[in-house]
Every structure is written in structure tokens, then in C-alpha cells.
Amino acid sequence: MPRPVTLFTGQWADLPLAQLAPLAKSMGYDGLELACWGDHFNVQEALSSPQYVKDKHALLAQHGLQCFAIGNHLVGQAVCDLIDERHQSILPPHVWGDGEPEGVRQRAASELANTAHAAAKFGVKTVSYTHLTLPTILLV
């Protein structure tokens, strides 16, 4: 296969993945970079539930799509940003916690490491975040 053409799903997070997948295929995409928001990819579920991983793979396969990367850009934003109340709306509650900036940064960094582990369980070798892309081998 020549270089695959992929769609990052973050801009489409208001659509359930079950609706977005057939749309992406109809637009000619070979695969997706799943965002870790909306219902596209849940890091904690992927870490704790083999069935979750199987179901996501089945959904993509049903539409002839592959997953080439997992994108956790919103959490990645919190690693180096100056944290303030605006971050609460883009972060999962377990990352935001009490909103204390250093705690948010530490939890965000931990969540990115967990994203790499979840991606590995999903069979994906690339995690992207805040304009950076690293092979999961560097993070796992």
C-alpha cells in the first residue's frame, strides 16, 4: 500500500465514531488517527478492557479502516501550558483533578504515558500530542 491517507478525528469529536468511520471511508481515507475525546478513544477503557479494544478494532474493520495513531492533544496541551480555569473544559476530570497547576501538569504527563500503553494494547505504534508525534516505543 502506498502511504496511507489518514484523518485525525479530533475535529469531528462531536460525531460518534460509528457515524464518522463510514463518512471517513466514503471520503477516501485509509485510516484514522483516533482522538482521545468524544467517544473515539478512551485511554482508561483501552487499558482496562480487552473487549473495548476488540470493539474499536471491529468498528474500524467494518468500514475498511485502520488506526495509524492515537492523538491526545488536549491532555498534551496541559503538560507545558500555564494552567488556568480554561483548561478544565478540555481535560478529563481525572486529569484536571483539583485544578492546582502543578498537579494538573503531573496528571497530564501521567495520562500521556498511559496513552502510550493504551496505544500499544490497541496495536498502534504512534501517539501524537500537542504538535508532536512519538513512536510509543519511546514512551512505553
Q: Whereabouts are the PLM-identified features?
A:
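Conserved small/polar residues in nucleotide/adenosyl-binding loops
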Residues: T130-T136
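N-terminal pre-domain/capping segments
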Residues: M1-V124
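Short, basic/glycine-rich phosphate-binding loops at helix/coil junctions
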Residues: T126-S128
